[in-house]
C-alpha cells in the first residue's frame, strides 16, 4: 500500500497543506504544537474515519470552518503491479454539527459519499503514538484492544463476532446487577435467562480467544525478533496469552462460576477478562521496563503487526510513527532508521538531524503550514 498524495484543508490547525510523500520514508519535522501529529492523524483517518487520538467532529475541523476536507490518492500493491496508472482517489469530509452535512463521509473514485467507516480495510495502516506506551504499563484492557483492533482490520468477520459478544455481555451484566426493591426477577427466571446468555457467550467467546491465540502465534516471533534487534541482543522479550480457560472450556467455566457471578453482580470470566503478558528477560515489563524499554516493546509490537498483516493479506500497511525516536539510544535509533526504509513510512520528529542524510522526503511543519526542506 502506498499514499501517493494528500491534500488537507481546514483540518485542526492546518488551513491548507499538500503532501507528496516518498516511496519509503517521509519525515515531518517541527517544534511541538505545530501540527505534525495532526497531519499524521489526517492520514490515519483514511483507514476508516476514526482518529487515533479521539476527538469529536467539531474538534477535527479548523476553528470557524464548517468542514475539514482530505483528498488522497492511494495505490495498493496489486494495482501497482497490474494498473500503475489507476490509483484510488479518496475524498473524506468531516462536518461540524451545524454544517450542511455533519459527521464523517468518504467518497472513493467519485462514487456517492457514504459513512467514512466504510473505508475500513481499503487503506491498511499501523500507527504508533506516545499514548501507545500504555500498552506496557496500562491495564489489560489496552492490550486486549491492541489484539482486537488488529484482528478487526484483518478479518471483517471478527468484528461481527466481537460486537455480538459485547452485546450479550452487556445483557448479562444488566441481568446480574441487583434491581431496585420490588423489581427483581424471580430467581428461577433469572437463572434460566442467565443460562441462555452464557450459552451464547461461550460460543462467541471461544471464537474470540481462538482467533487471538492464532494471531499471537504469528505475531509473537516477529515482535520478539524485532526487540532482539532493537536491543542488539541485550534483552529478550516474550509474549504470552494469559487465558482464563483452555480451548473448549469456557462453557464449563461459566457454569462453575455462575453462583459467584450472581453474588458479585457482574461477569467474572471470559475473553474480556484475559490479558497479553509482555515479559523482558522473564520479568513483567509493566513492572520493570524503563521508558526506553517500553518504547522499544511497543515499537516491536507495531512493526510486527505490520509484518503480520503483510503476510496475511499480501498488502504491507503504511507505517505512521509519531515522535518515535524519543528516549531511544543511538543504536536503537539507527536500527529504526534502517527499518523505516523498507516500506512507506511517515515519521514525525522535533529534530531533523537524524534524517537529513536519509534518502527520504523531509518536510517542516510550522504553525500548521507545511513546507518541503
Residue spans of the language-model regions?
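Conserved NTPase motor "head" modules and their coupling/switch loops across ABC/AAA+ ATPases, GTPases
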Residues: 1-31, 45, 64, 185-203, ...
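Conserved lysine of the Walker
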Residues: 36
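A conserved P-loop NTPase coupling/switch region
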Residues: 117-122, 129-199, 203
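Nucleotide-state sensing region of NTPase/ATPase domains
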Residues: 48-142, 146-154, 158, 220, ...
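Structural recognition of the conserved hydrophobic beta-strand(s) that form the central parallel beta-sheet
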Residues: 72, 344-351
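Walker B catalytic acidic pair
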Residues: 322-324
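Short aromatic-centered micro-motifs
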Residues: 106, 278, 364
Amino acid at each position: 500500500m502506498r499514499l501517493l498524495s494528500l491534500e488537507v484543508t481546514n483540518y485542526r490547525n492546518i488551513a491548507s497543506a499538500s503532501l507528496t510523500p516518498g516511496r519509503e520514508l517521509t519525515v515531518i519535522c517541527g517544534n511541538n504544537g505545530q501540527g505534525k501529529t495532526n497531519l499524521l492523524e489526517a492520514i490515519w483517518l483514511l483507514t476508516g474515519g476514526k482518529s487515533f487520538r479521539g476527538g469529536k467532529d467539531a474538534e477535527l475541523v479548523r476553528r470557524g470552518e464548517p468542514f475539514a476536507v482530505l483528498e488522497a490518492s492511494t495505490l495498493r500493491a496489486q494495482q501497482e503491479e497490474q494498473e500503475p496508472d489507476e490509483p484510488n482517489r479518496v475524498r473524506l469530509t468531516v462536518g461540524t454539527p451545524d454544517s450542511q452535512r455533519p459527521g464523517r463521509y468518504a467518497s472513493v473514485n467519485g462514487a456517492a459519499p457514504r459513512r467514512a467507516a466504510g473505508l475500513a480495510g481499503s487503506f491498511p495502516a499501523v500507527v504508533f503514538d506516545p499514548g501507545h506506551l500504555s500498552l506496557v504499563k496500562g491495564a489489560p484492557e489496552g492490550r486486549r484492544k491492541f489484539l482486537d483492533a488488529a484482528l478487526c482490520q484483518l478479518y471483517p468477520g471478527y468484528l461481527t463476532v466481537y460486537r455480538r459478544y459485547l452485546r450479550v455481555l452487556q445483557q448479562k451484566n444488566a441481568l446480574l446487577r441487583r434491581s431496585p426493591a420490588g423489581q427483581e426477577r424471580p430467581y428461577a427466571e433469572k437463572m434460566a435467562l442467565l443460562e441462555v446468555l452464557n450459552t451464547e457467550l461461550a460460543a462467541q467467546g471461544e471464537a474470540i480467544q481462538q482467533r487471538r491465540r492464532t494471531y499471537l502465534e504469528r505475531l509473537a516471533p516477529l515482535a520478539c525478533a524485532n526487540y532482539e534487534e532493537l536491543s542488539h541482543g541485550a534483552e529478550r522479550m516474550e509474549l504470552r496469552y494469559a487465558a482464563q480457560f483452555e480451548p473448549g472450556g469456557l462453557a464449563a467455566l461459566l457454569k462453575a462460576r455462575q453462583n459467584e457471578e450472581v453474588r458479585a453482580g457482574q461477569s467474572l470470566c471470559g475473553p474480556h477478562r484475559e490479558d497479553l503478558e509482555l515479559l523482558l528477560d522473564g520479568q513483567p515489563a509493566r513492572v520493570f521496563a524503563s521508558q526506553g524499554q517500553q518504547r522499544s516493546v511497543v515499537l516491536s509490537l507495531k512493526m510486527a503487526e505490520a509484518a503480520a498483516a503483510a503476510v496475511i493479506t499480501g498488502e504491507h500497511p503504511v507505517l505512521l510513527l509519531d515522535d518515535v525516536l524519543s528516549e531511544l539510544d543511538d543504536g536503537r535509533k539507527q536500527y529504526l532508521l534502517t527499518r523505516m526504509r523498507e516500506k512507506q513510512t511517515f515519521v514525525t520528529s522535533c529534530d531533523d538531524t537524524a534524517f537529513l542524510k536519509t534518502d527520504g522526503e523531509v518536510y517542516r511543519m510550522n504553525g500548521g503550514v507545511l513546507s518541503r526542506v
